[in-house]
Amino acid sequence: RGLVGSEMCIRDRIEIFPSEYIHVGGDECPKVRWEKCPKCQARIKALGLKSDKNHSKEERLQSFVINHIEKFLNDHGRQIIGWDEILEGGLAPNATVMSWRGESGGIEAAKQKHDVIMTPNTYLYFDYYQAKDTENEPFGIGGYLPMERVYSYEPMPASLTPEEQQYIKGVQANLWTEYIATFSHAQYM
């Protein structure tokens, strides 16, 4: 039932938005809760998913869902993008990865020949504080991130070969607005 509901939701988005790419998230999936969820465990058992040295069976369940959604989107002429958590459990065949928890997810995806958008929070999260004196700053959700650090970011990891570097497609800076109360606050950040 859940997968059918996901397809219906995605089908609605496809009809509204013409973009080739659909971002499917992949973060904020509470796998520790899935360990205790009887329905999740029943689904894991029914699918025959197993843990191994690299992935838990709950990560494999997320990969199953992401792969299903990717196939659905590909069948409708679209591509998926997801946060680097979609690497956990095995990456869907055509997925683009947005590496936000540092660069390691992007490096791993590029080594697997997947397109990558670098968006590491330690360089490109604009909802972080811009001054050390946080008491006199508009509210920020993260730590201190001066513009000098943002400008210093080199999105092409030296650890990748020239062939692997071709999969790094660009960068994205994020401003998450759940803690941004006003438009002027957003402009300041």
Annotate each PLM feature.
Residues 79-95, 100-189:
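Flexible, acidic glycine-rich loops studded with aromatic residues
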Residues 12-16, 20, 68-76, 112:
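Generic, well-ordered alpha-helical scaffold segments in large soluble proteins
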